[in-house]
Amino acid sequence: MTKKPQAKDHIFAKNMLPGDFIFDEKVAGVFEDMINRSVPGYSTIIAMIGVLAERYYQKDSIIYDLGCSLGGATFSVFERLKDQGCSIVAIDNSIAMLKRLVTKQQKFEGAHYCIESRCENIQVAQIENASVVILNFTLQFVPLADRAALIERVFKGMNSGGVLIISEKIISPDNHLNELIIELYHQFKENMGYSKLEISQKRSALENVLIPETLDSHRARILQTGFSSFEVWFQSLNFASMVAIK
């Protein structure tokens, strides 16, 4: 499959009026470039989500990608499990994102049989008979007060032995180290071609929208919900991916 060049992310390249970050048509159009240049190790996370899904998938169960955006994790899982006739439900509340996912889906042979896309709020989406649930940089956008209820909803809809994969931007409980890691992260973004203006403006836009937590907060919530085990399997700077087993 020949890939078209990614549209370049220049959304925050010029001075803008303050406003919250939203997943609109403009963001969806450059999201693939944006996420790959903004999240260290993103391609590794996406590839390994497919590997984890293949390991924990249960025959005739359902795989959920909650907050699927353009379907990076969805298609990684599909490529691993397409020969098993898997059922993947990809959910997002951004129509602009889902339109592009559906277009991309047409390029994967057999994907229309396996992947169902839904424009829904993941906080009220029905989850049942799930062996794999993915929250790939999604939980961080859910209001803090609602996160425990969402994880509880996921847990109740999962089969025993199933896996929950959560990727998140995180913070350190140590203020000095937290500032150090943020500075290193901004240097990473500069190395990826973003200007100081772009970094500053995007940070301001995300300030009230993306609320990161510590790894200990994630661990406590997961174990309190009833998952039998939890581990961080990947971390680069202030981004981590975790697994929880029911």
Residue ranges and their predicted role:
Residues M16-F21, E25-I46:
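Class I SAM-dependent methyltransferase Rossmann-like catalytic core
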Residues G41-K59:
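Conserved alpha-helix/loop element of class I SAM-dependent methyltransferases that forms part
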Residues I62-D65, L70-Q123:
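Class I SAM-dependent methyltransferase SAM/SAH-binding core
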Residues I134:
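A conserved beta-strand element that flanks and buttresses the S-adenosyl-L-methionine
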Residues A148-S160:
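A short glycine-rich, Lys/Arg-flanked "PGG" loop and its adjoining helix->strand segment in the class I
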Residues G161-K169:
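Conserved beta-strand signature within the Rossmann-like core of class I S-adenosyl-L-methionine
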Residues I170-R221:
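C-terminal alpha-helical "lid/dimerization" subdomain adjacent to the S-adenosyl-L-methionine
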Residues T225-K246:
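Core SAM-dependent methyltransferase catalytic element
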